[in-house]
Amino acid sequence: MANGIAVAINTLSSELAAGGARTDGSLVKAALASVSPADILLQPIFNPVGGYASYVVPAAFVLILQQMLLIGASLLTVVALTQPVNGAFASVLGRSVAHLTIYLPALALYFIVLPRFYGFSTLGQPLQLFALASLFVLATSFMGQAAGAWFKHPETPTLIFLGTSLPQLFVTGFSWPREAVPKSMQALGYIFPSDFAIDGIVRINQMGASLWEVVRDWRGLWGLTVIYFALAVMSAFLVRRRQAHG
């Protein structure tokens, strides 16, 4: 927008100055020098490509990772709870560690390799990036397990969570102004880890922020991790108990 305004002003100034031009161009040069004594050079810092894709795609990567893990964790939980395995606490924790281990290469691909391949800004520290991203994966895993405990059919999580993808695109505020989203919808978006993760991961990876500068997102993901872990353990315990008495 700033670039467009600057171009429009310079174009108008040039046209006004050229209105009384001389054959040698001296009047035009003098008028332009008085209107714009210094050349304006606009250089985007966090969006060097200057395109919409470089603004949207890094945030979309986070949402893609969340939706895949939500569906996968829920689906595997539906199947796992049909097996005669005791210990809700250990099983929930074990599955989350497995999800995190499997997702580490995906985090490296989506947050390190692909941004550099597409020429996106990558100013963040990898350790801080992976600290926040790992917490995001754990929160998503626990959420998927908590939800998956109450599904009867393995295909149900795919239908439900895919339907939430498009609303999350708008609620998180990167494809639509957050100020234009109703407060009730914003509050509803906080139940998904991607709401905090998109803001925090993009700020760290693309803008070079530290964990301290995204402490709101860090605390939000910790809160969701604890809440969904408790819900996943309780859900697994209740489902096991219902199966034992059913």
How would you describe each model-predicted region?
Residues M1-G72:
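Transport-system extracytoplasmic interface segments
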Residues R22-D24, L107-A108, S141:
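A generic alpha-helix surface/boundary motif
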Residues L32, L41, I45, V49, ...:
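Juxtamembrane loop-helix boundary motifs flanking transmembrane segments in multi-pass membrane proteins
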Residues Q43-P115:
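Hydrophobic alpha-helical transmembrane segments of multi-pass membrane transport proteins
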Residues T101, I112-V113, S121-G246:
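Membrane-spanning alpha-helical segments of multipass transporters and channels
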